[in-house]
A protein has these predicted regions:
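Short acidic, Gly/Ser-rich segments with clustered Asp/Glu that frequently serve as metal-coordination loops
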Residues: 25-31
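A short alpha/beta connector and helix-capping loop motif
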Residues: 15, 33-61
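Short beta-strand segments at enzyme active-site cores
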Residues: 21-22, 59-66, 147
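Active-site-adjacent betaalpha module
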Residues: 1-18, 72-197
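Long hydrophobic alpha-helices with heptad-repeat/coiled-coil character
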Residues: 31-32, 41, 50, 54, ...
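Active-site loop signature of alpha/beta-hydrolase-fold enzymes
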Residues: 27, 69, 153
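Glycine-rich, proline-tolerant flexible connector loops at the mouths of alpha/beta enzymes
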Residues: 35, 68-70
Length: 197
């Protein structure tokens, strides 16, 4: 009789990331609304790749969304709903917040701390939610990996959205790792094959 040993039970928990998808809400794709990101298609495609990969290999997934009692991100309006194709599964975490950082939700902060403090961040908007979350993760001693091509930023006054987003990625480099979706997937796939997944 052969003994089967689950190598995952011996894995360093801090090396297993949670995929955090931030604000994949209709507000960001509902043109001509104020928070609509015109060139969100590539970011959404890469978010979809990351989500499919995380689900396929069994990584934890967390969805966060902005909720506010205002004309934007109002739960009474359909714009606060998930973008079709990005609805959380019942086995996935869902958190709501009213401030830019994901850590504005205490349950998120607790889940990340208790889950090893390593997460992969993608979604909207880079210049607010993603940047604020990366900075706060650094201050809490958590490890964040930002999928820059699975995120998008809004323009700021006369600064083009693409310039803002490039700057956000450079700033997040100060607080964590910045990579592409395909590079992250390749790295995760290699890690899983080493563990025997």
């Amino acid at each position: 009789m052969k003994n089967v040993v689950n190598l995952r039970s011996y894995a360093n928990v801090s090396l297993i990331p949670t995929l955090v998808l931030l604000d994949l809400q209709q507000e960001y794709v509902a043109s001509p609304r104020l928070f609509s990101i015109p060139d969100a298609d590539e970011a959404l495609q890469n978010c979809r790749l990351a989500l499919t990969h995380a689900r396929r290999i069994g990584l934890p997934v967390a969805f966060l969304r902005m909720i506010d009692r205002a004309p934007y991100f109002n739960p009474a309006l359909s714009y606060s709903n998930w973008i079709p194709g990005f609805e959380p599964m019942t086995s996935e975490m869902v958190f709501e917040r009213s401030k830019p950082s994901c850590y504005a939700n205490r349950e998120f902060a607790y889940a990340m701390s208790e889950g090893g403090g390593h997460f992969v961040l993608a979604g909207f908007s880079g210049e607010a939610g993603c940047l604020a979350t990366a900075v706060e993760a650094f201050h809490r001693g958590h490890q964040v990996t930002y999928l820059a091509d699975a995120s998008a930023s809004l323009r700021l006054n006369q600064i083009a959205a693409s310039t803002v987003h490039q700057t956000v990625a450079e700033l997040i480099c100060l607080y964590g790792e910045v990579t592409t979706t395909r590079s992250w997937i390749a790295e995760q796939s290699a890690s899983v094959s080493c563990v025997g997944g």
